[in-house]
């Protein structure tokens, strides 16, 4: 579906951040800023935090210990819950190789569940 040569390919549509966050919230969801290190720059991440995000993906395969500290502090400063992800896509030979390679604390999971 994501590849242009796929028979089911659907082109991406660019949507403004406030609009997509509104859609997520109206659907009862929580808007999370995903893998901030992979965004343009930390300055841009901070600029994006003017929007009504609920959480931030602090733990990610591309985040080192310094990144985790920095994003954890940003999440706390902006009252965002902390989440994490492995970015596992099931592609052989591409890290992470399996579920469970990257974990978040039970406290972070409990906080997330309490917000649902």
Protein language model annotation of sequence segments:
Residues 18-22, 26-33, 37-116:
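Charged catalytic cores and adjacent phosphate/nucleic-acid-binding surfaces used
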Residues 1-16, 20:
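Active-site-proximal loop/helix segment associated with metal-binding centers of metalloenzymes
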């Amino acid at each position: 579906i994501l590849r242009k040569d796929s028979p089911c390919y659907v082109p991406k549509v660019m949507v403004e951040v406030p609009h997509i966050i509104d859609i997520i919230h109206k659907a009862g969801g929580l808007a999370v800023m995903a893998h901030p290190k992979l965004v343009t720059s930390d300055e841009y991440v901070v600029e994006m935090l003017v929007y009504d995000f609920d959480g931030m993906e602090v733990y990610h395969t591309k985040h080192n210990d310094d990144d985790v500290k920095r994003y954890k502090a940003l999440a706390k400063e902006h009252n965002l819950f902390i989440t994490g992800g492995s970015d596992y896509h099931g592609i052989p030979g591409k890290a992470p190789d399996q579920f469970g390679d990257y974990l978040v604390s039970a406290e972070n999971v409990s906080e997330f569940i309490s917000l649902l």
